[in-house]
A protein has these predicted regions:
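Short, conserved active-site entrance elements at the starts or edges of catalytic domains
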Residues: 27-49
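A short secondary-structure junction signal
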Residues: 10-15, 39-41, 72, 108
């Protein structure tokens, strides 16, 4: 909604509070909304981020169309976006493991009320695990984002 900055807001917005940048980032991370610099950066594709409904395999020619059609048809994504939480501090680019093997990487992180939360790209073979380990043995709880559209479904 665009409003004139000098005009009064209409109800119900007038009685609400403006969201802070931190609150918006918390919402983005908790809901698994991928348009952040750690997720949409040229290193990932829309299917890994759960955006399969936003990809057309029928529409005209576009860069990557053939690759997207192949990935959709063969369930070929190597990793998928997941929400995570952990009581210990972790940062973007931290490597994740499962039973000592490479499992993924944190793409976004935020501390809120003593808990760390964020998004991570998790390798396909590790998606079923509810927990992964951070670089120093931290235990991360992993879950599929609410709005994630599984390219394999």
């Amino acid at each position: 909604v665009w409003c004139d900055p000098d005009a009064a807001l209409p109800e119900p917005w007038a009685s609400g509070e403006a969201a802070t940048a931190t609150a918006l980032e918390q919402w983005r991370l908790q809901s698994g909304f991928p348009p952040g610099p750690g997720e949409l950066n040229g290193e990932t594709n829309p299917l890994e981020l759960g955006l399969v409904a936003q990809v057309s395999t029928e529409k005209g020619c576009y860069l990557g169309q053939e690759t997207m059609a192949k990935l959709i048809g063969q369930a070929g994504v190597k990793q998928q976006l997941r929400c995570w939480s952990c009581p210990s501090p972790l940062a973007a680019a931290a490597k994740l493991t499962l039973d000592g093997e490479r499992a993924g990487v944190i793409t976004s992180a935020l501390e809120r009320d003593g808990t760390w939360l964020g998004l991570a790209l998790v390798r396909r073979q590790c998606l079923a695990s509810p927990t992964l380990e951070g670089p120093n043995g931290e235990q991360l709880q992993i879950r599929q984002p609410e709005a994630f559209q599984d390219p394999d479904a």
